[in-house]
């Protein structure tokens, strides 16, 4: 698949440690001094936006410990956002959907082993789900990847069925 479609793990890997360090330092700061006025939060948010190039408003630095942990938050911030790819092919769409439905592969690379599921899983914020939402706005729905009753049977849609729905009137 083309590089402009794939998640940019190398960029994420380069800035991950710095982002994680900022998140943990902010937590330590709050534990010691508090941040009732949010001044330190805004400073950290600005630094993270500068490092990642992302709009930080969709991330919560306050309560990551109640969510998925600092490491996952740091990865989500570090991984570049998906891009609009107007000339995506149906074959490329099929590869994406098949990856999203397949079990997570095993990696020898610890970074990929830890975080690949975060790009593949069919949920809000996951890289490929967000890629589909961006590039197939008229036909994408998270529900495409959920079990449903079809002709009286509870099942998931197949990869081909999902691709046909997403591809819609394009083809």
Residue ranges and their predicted role:
Residues 105-115:
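Short amphipathic N-terminal alpha-helix
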Residues 7, 96-105:
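N-terminal acidic leader/helix
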Residues 1-42:
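N-terminal leader regions
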Residues 80-82:
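Aromatic- and Gly/Pro-enriched, solvent-exposed loop/edge beta-strand patches characteristic
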Residues 28, 32-76, 114-171:
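Compact alpha-helical subdomains of small soluble proteins
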Residues 16, 20, 41-44, 90-93, ...:
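Short amphipathic alpha-helical segments that mediate assembly, nucleic-acid/protein binding
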């Amino acid at each position: 698949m083309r590089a402009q479609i794939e998640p940019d793990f190398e960029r994420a890997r380069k800035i991950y440690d710095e982002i994680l360090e900022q998140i943990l330092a902010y937590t330590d700061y709050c534990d010691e001094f508090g941040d009732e006025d949010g001044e330190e939060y805004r400073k950290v948010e600005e630094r993270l936006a500068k490092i990642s190039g992302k709009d930080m408003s969709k991330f919560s630095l306050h309560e990551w410990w109640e969510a998925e942990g600092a490491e996952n938050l740091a990865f989500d911030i570090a991984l570049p956002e998906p891009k609009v790819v107007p000339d995506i092919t149906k074959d490329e769409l099929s590869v994406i959907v098949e990856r999203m439905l397949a079990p997570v592969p095993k990696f020898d690379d610890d970074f990929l082993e830890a975080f690949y599921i975060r790009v593949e899983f069919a949920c809000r914020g996951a890289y490929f789900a967000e890629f589909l939402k961006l590039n197939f706005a008229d036909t994408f729905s998270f529900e495409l990847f959920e079990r449903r009753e079809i002709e009286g049977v509870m099942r998931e849609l197949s990869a081909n069925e999902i691709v046909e729905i997403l591809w819609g009137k394009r083809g």
